[in-house]
Amino acid sequence: MTLPTTNLGKTGLTVSRLCLGTMTFGLQTDEETSRHILDTAADGGINFLDTADVYPLGGGLATAGRTEEIVGRWLKGKREHFILATKCVGRVGPAPWDQGASRKHILDAIDASLRRLGTDYIDLYQLHSDDASTPLDETLEALDAVVRAGKVRYIGVSNFLAYRLARALGRAETRNLTKFISIQPCYNLLFREIERELLPLAKEEGLGVISYNPLAGGLLTGKHTLAQGPTSGTRFTLGAAAERYQDRYWRDREFNTVEDLRTVADLAGFSLTTLAVAWVLSNPIITAPIIGASRPEQLTDNLKAAELKLDDSLKQKLDDLTAEYRRGDSLR
């Protein structure tokens, strides 16, 4: 299968219109299954992989880095065929400097990620979140240093407010430092807050947008019910992440909307999963939504979404059904 490709922001880096997220690898998903998922994604045309030094999701310090190790072992012998993105800032050790965006942590973190991933460069190195406790210039200088050292090709951010991103872009330009070329925000039919400020900024600055949670943590698959409660082994029950996911999506309003969306999907002749991912892809500002899986077969409906072009009336219906989700806290 050949997926459509596009450039990542204003760069010359060509990526598939779907990016494979790996945060389930090493806890929710064992290594053998993770390798099957990676094989299925590659066979489906995905050349863009996203991970982070704190993954797997729901783990702790004892498991931090495990996902990168799994991805690195799978990549052996085929690194040149994939665009590899990872992230730093999250806590990976017990010391005070084992987290954040300080110069020390960034320089330590990039070397550790390179070792785990078995590579000598990262295509896209991202700040996993904002670190307001570290001077912005210190962070930008450290990221510029790893780019100039050849360890990183491009830099990006995840979970940033628009005003902080705008400030960072301005400081980098003023000081002639490497600028961020992409953002990784949460975006789906039930979480549209970034349409107000962050996406307009990305469009204005020509940033790539690699959005995560296109299926709202699995809620937009339709497999969950409010009455039965969160299913064991899903993002709504995994470790420290469970509370965040429940706070973001586990409410009457969201479940009612999912039922309305399911009706639309049924009438249109698509699975809710395919329709939800296709809706994200229909936004011209989005470069590639990050799709994840705990089983290889879960990728099937996601891959179909790349071939589905929503007609104007169907897209408008989905927009109207979920218009209220444009209001809220973009970092929930």
Model-inferred region functions:
Residues M1-F82:
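N-terminal binding-site loop/beta-alpha segment at the start of enzyme catalytic domains
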Residues K10, D43, G72-E80, R115-G118, ...:
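Acidic (Asp/Glu)-rich catalytic clusters
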Residues T22-E32, V92-K104, D130-T134:
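Active-site mouth loops of central-metabolism enzymes
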Residues D30-A41, A101-L117, L165-L169:
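Short, acidic/polar
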Residues F48-A52, L84-K87, Y121-Q126, G156-V157, ...:
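Short beta-strand segments at enzyme active-site cores
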Residues V54-Y55, G77-A101:
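Structural motif corresponding to the early beta-alpha repeats
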Residues L114-S133:
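Active-site groove signature of glycoside hydrolases
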Residues D130, T134-L321:
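Beta/alpha (TIM)-barrel catalytic core signal, keyed to glycine-rich beta->alpha loops juxtaposed to Asp/Glu
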